[in-house]
Amino acid sequence: MRALYPESFKSKVAMYSGAWCGCRPRTRQLSGRLGRGTCGGRQPASRSADFSCECVLLLPLQDPSLLPQKLGLFAGTLVRLSP
C-alpha cells in the first residue's frame, strides 16, 4: 500500500507523540469514513455532511508508515495533526 502523504508530512508525523486528527462527518451520510476536506474552519470539498475536526486515534508513532492501515484512510482524506 502506497503512502497517502508526502515525505515531509511523514517526518512531521514522527515528531508528535500521539494525536492524529482528521475531518470526520458528524452524520452517517458518508458511511462513517473520514471526510474529504480540511479542518480549521475551511469548507470541506463535500457538502453531504457537517464536518468537525477531531482526534481519531492515539498511538505511538515510531512507524508512521502504519498509519494508513490503522486509520483505514482513503486518498484525499488526510488533513492535519494536533500537537
UniProtKB/Swiss-Prot annotation:
It comes from Scylla paramamosain (Mud crab). It comes from the Eukaryota. Keywords: Antibiotic, Antimicrobial, Fungicide, Immunity, Innate immunity. This is Scyreptin.
